[in-house]
């Protein structure tokens, strides 16, 4: 298999796993009656951001193969997190007159997800050194 096909395969397999995991998270949260606020999207974005931060921190210290980076970073975590769903949820909340919820959804996703990346990188750097 040439490198390009292998890279597509890594992204596709990782993406299938990540998208399935996100779907499972949504179903799990809905089964607990969590519907008033889009916590499932927020949760997957925070978790995905944290693990992407760990991957980036690890890659700064250790060599990571292109296939691993594509499988984990682009495929699995890229499909697990979701900017498009986040965007649709913000528009839906705003359209329903839920402006505070829309604003909180934006703020939480941006601030907490960036903090999760930072926390993961700091955690990795303090535990590895």
Swiss-Prot record:
The UniProt entry's GO biological process terms, in alphabetical order, are: cellular detoxification of fluoride
Q: Per UniProt, which keywords does this protein have?
A: Cell inner membrane, Cell membrane, Ion channel, Ion transport, Membrane, Metal-binding, Sodium, Transmembrane, Transmembrane helix, Transport
| Gene Ontology terms, MF aspect | fluoride channel activity; metal ion binding
One GO cellular component term, please give it: plasma membrane
Q: Domain of life here?
A: Bacteria
Which residues, if any, are the signal sequence? none
Q: Can you state which reaction this protein catalyses?
A: fluoride(in) = fluoride(out)
Under the heading InterPro entries, the entry gives:
FluC
Q: Which residues cross the membrane?
A: 8-28, 36-56, 71-91, 103-123
Family per record: Belongs to the fluoride channel Fluc/FEX (TC 1.A.43) family.
PANTHER family per UniProt: FLUORIDE EXPORT PROTEIN 1-RELATED
Q: What does this protein do?
A: Fluoride-specific ion channel. Important for reducing fluoride concentration in the cell, thus reducing its toxicity.
Q: Per its record, how is this protein called by name?
A: Fluoride-specific ion channel FluC
Give the species.
Answer: Idiomarina loihiensis (strain ATCC BAA-735 / DSM 15497 / L2-TR)
- Organism placement in taxonomy: Bacteria, Pseudomonadati, Pseudomonadota, Gammaproteobacteria, Alteromonadales
